[in-house]
A protein has these predicted regions:
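Short alpha-helical elements
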Residues: 1-312
Length: 312
C-alpha cells in the first residue's frame, strides 16, 4: 500500500507540484502492477519518455481542460520541458498513450485498492450520454457506427443523440469504482448487470431507470441490495424517509458527472477512433479519482469533489 509519512508534503502549491506528485504515484503503481509484458516489451528502454511519464502527461492534460491533444502537447513542450527533457514526438506520444489504455485502466483499479482512502459499502449507479457527433452528421459517422454507436434518448436533456452511454458506479465519497461504455440505446439495467458482475455484499442506490422485479431478484442472489426509486404509479413505494435518503445521496452522482463533463470535458468527443475515445475516457476517470484521493489526504478541510482547488 502507498504510505504517507508525517514529514511528507501536505500542500500542492503549484500545478508543477501536482505534475510531480502525479508522476510519483503513477510510477509507483506502474512498477508494482503493470504486466511484465508491458514493462519489458521490446525497445521500451530506448523510448525517450517512460510509460509513467506518458500517463502522467495525459492525466494532467485532461484535468487542465485542454481537450485538444495537440494543443496540450505543445503547451507541455513550451512550459514544462524542464520536467520532461527527453520529450518525444507528438505522434509517438499519442500512439504509446493509446497502447497503454489497458494498463491505465489497471492502474485505476489498483489506485482505489492501494491508496489509503476511506471507501463506503454504498454505491450509486447512473449513466450519462456520450454523443460522438452532431445529430445531423450521424449517418456519416461510420467509424463509431462500426463499433456499436447508435441512437439513444437522453431524458434529462429531452433529446435524441447518436453515440454511446457511459454507465458508472460511484461511492458516496465520489470515487468511480467501475464504468463501461455501451451503445446509446442500451437499457440502464443492462449496464448495472455488467458493472456488478462478480461483485457482492454492498448496497446500490439508483433512480427510476433501474426499477424491475427481475433485476431486484438478480441483485438479491448476488447479495447486493438495490434501492431504486419507484415510479409515481407504483403500488408499492418506499417510505418518505427512504425516498429522501436516496434523493440526498444521489446528489453525489450529479456532482461527479458535472466534474467529468465540465472540468474534464467527458462529453466533448474529439477522438477519431473508438480506441482513442476509450483511452481518453479511461484517462479522465483515473485523473478524477486521483484528485479525489489527493484531496482526501492533502486538503482535509476541502470537500473531496473540489478538484479545481487542488490543481489551480
Amino acid at each position: 500500500m502507498l504510505k504517507f509519512q508525517s514529514n511528507d508534503t501536505t500542500i500542492i502549491a503549484t500545478f508543477e507540484d501536482f505534475i510531480l506528485t502525479t508522476y510519483v504515484i503513477i510510477d509507483e503503481l506502474y512498477h508494482r502492477f503493470a504486466p511484465s509484458e508491458v514493462r519489458k516489451r521490446r525497445h521500451v528502454l530506448d523510448a525517450k519518455l517512460s510509460d509513467s511519464e506518458i500517463i502522467t502527461i495525459a492525466l494532467c492534460g485532461e484535468l487542465v481542460g485542454i481537450d485538444s491533444e495537440n494543443a496540450w502537447f505543445s503547451f507541455v513542450k513550451k512550459n514544462y520541458r524542464h520536467l520532461f527533457p527527453q520529450l518525444c514526438s507528438r505522434s509517438r506520444f499519442n500512439r504509446t498513450r493509446r497502447a497503454l489504455m489497458q494498463t491505465t485502466e489497471l492502474l485505476r483499479q489498483k489506485l482505489l485498492s492501494d491508496f489509503p482512502v476511506p471507501i463506503s459499502p454504498y454505491c450509486i449507479i447512473d449513466s450519462f450520454p456520450l454523443a460522438v457527433c452532431k445529430f445531423g452528421r450521424a449517418r456519416y459517422c461510420k467509424v463509431f457506427r462500426n463499433h456499436g454507436a447508435d441512437y439513444g434518448k437522453c431524458p434529462s436533456k429531452k433529446e435524441t443523440y447518436f453515440g454511446y452511454k457511459v454507465h458508472a458506479l460511484i461511492t458516496l465519497e465520489g470515487y468511480i469504482t467501475a464504468f463501461e461504455i455501451t451503445p446509446a440505446s442500451t437499457d440502464d439495467r443492462e449496464g448495472l448487470r455488467d458493472l456488478v458482475d462478480n461483485c457482492s455484499n454492498f448496497t446500490v442506490l439508483a433512480d427510476k431507470g433501474y426499477v424491475g422485479e427481475r433485476l431486484m431478484q438478480e441483485m438479491q442472489e448476488q447479495n447486493i441490495c438495490l434501492f431504486a426509486l419507484k415510479r409515481s404509479n407504483s403500488k408499492e413505494n418506499w417510505t418518505k424517509s427512504v425516498r429522501q435518503l436516496i434523493f440526498k445521496q444521489r446528489r453525489r452522482v450529479e456532482t461527479v458527472f458535472s466534474q467529468l463533463t465540465g472540468q474534464l470535458n467527458a462529453e466533448r468527443v474529439l477522438a477519431k477512433s473508438f480506441q482513442g475515445l476509450c483511452t481518453r475516457l479511461v484517462n479522465k476517470v483515473l485523473a478524477y479519482n486521483l484528485c479525489i484521493a489527493l484531496n482526501s489526504i492533502f486538503n482535509e478541510p476541502c470537500e473531496l469533489g473540489k478538484i479545481k482547488e487542488l490543481i489551480f
